[in-house]
Swiss-Prot record:
Binds 16S rRNA, required for the assembly of 30S particles and may also be responsible for determining the conformation of the 16S rRNA at the A site. This is Small ribosomal subunit protein uS14A. One of its GO terms (cellular component) is small ribosomal subunit. The gene is rpsN. It comes from Mycolicibacterium vanbaalenii (strain DSM 7251 / JCM 13017 / BCRC 16820 / KCTC 9966 / NRRL B-24157 / PYR-1) (Mycobacterium vanbaalenii). GO terms for molecular function: rRNA binding; structural constituent of ribosome. Part of the 30S ribosomal subunit. Contacts proteins S3 and S10.
């Protein structure tokens, strides 16, 4: 079980990313556009740097939705590998079967 503070911190980061996503996308489009003037590009870069660090999506950590475990996360289920195994053995994941060949 992850610390409650880490889970809350990650949720706060998700909210900040969502709040700043549109403006970040606009600034990145200005920076990447070949038709942008150098002055406008520098202005967009400085504005992007002024945004909070937590507004960057790479700072969000994928965590297990049940207990917040940060490692071994499977996107398909939103759970950690440990939790997927437990729930699959209990038959609580529809369509998941133990493999045999």
């Amino acid at each position: 079980m992850a610390k409650k503070s880490k889970i809350v911190q990650n949720e706060r980061r998700r909210e900040i990313v969502a709040r700043h996503a549109e403006r970040r996308a606009e600034l990145k489009a200005i920076i990447k556009s070949p038709s942008t003037t150098p002055e406008a590009r520098v202005a967009a870069q400085s504005e992007l740097n002024r945004q909070p660090r937590d507004a960057s999506p790479v700072r969000v950590r994928n965590r297990d939705s049940v207990d917040g475990r940060p490692r071994g996360h499977l996107r398909k289920f939103g759970l950690s590998r440990v939790r997927v195994r437990e729930l699959a053995h209990q038959g609580q994941l529809p369509g998941v079967r133990k493999s045999s060949w």
